[in-house]
């Protein structure tokens, strides 16, 4: 992104732009579809989400550690039963969807949705090691103005208590230098009536500006968005 700064801070030895300039620019890019969208985790939640973004004109990068998943998508094929391969193929062919194992790709993105697994432990608590690993990757490549949304199923407070402190180790601050939000995934695999697009989505942010930005983004490809 390119910005005209009015208010700046020092980050990595250089001046960067603070909100609200970052907000205006990201809103503009979201609305005109020039924002580069990314999804971390290409399972039954992440891949359908990436496709909905691509349907609405976003250029989407899917990031997954599985070489098999990445190669399958880039061949224009699906590995999820209720996701047709012809849809994947269409968006790969027109360069709206690509998959990569390169974690550094997050630094090129304007929006990042975290859709990694959170399997239950024996005590029924969610295993958050995949979330932590994903957030640490983002921390290492984060830049001002990015929108980061946690979708993985977890307990209330995870975004503020776990995700935010890790990201802020970068020296940037949520709600000031980047946007941080949570929107719990609600997909029902195999349900032909209610799918990613038409399942209402609750969206919350660590600040009101973060919530506003996340809601704006989701409204581009989700029929009903409920800010909280």
Regions found by a protein language model. Name each.
Residues 38-40:
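Conserved N-terminal Rossmann-fold NAD(P)-binding element of oxidoreductases
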Residues 112-114, 150, 204:
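Redox-cofactor binding/interface segments in oxidoreductases and associated redox assembly factors
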Residues 19, 165-181, 187, 192-228:
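Internal alpha-helical scaffold of NAD(P)-dependent oxidoreductase catalytic cores
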Residues 116-118, 153, 207:
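Short glycine-/small-residue-rich Rossmann-like dinucleotide-binding loops
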Residues 45:
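Hydrophobic/small residue at the entry helix of a nucleotide-binding pocket
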Residues 120-186:
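Rossmann-like NAD(P)(H) cofactor-binding subdomain of soluble oxidoreductases
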Residues 3-4, 8-36, 55, 59-61, ...:
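Conserved N-terminal Rossmann-fold NAD(P) cofactor-binding segment
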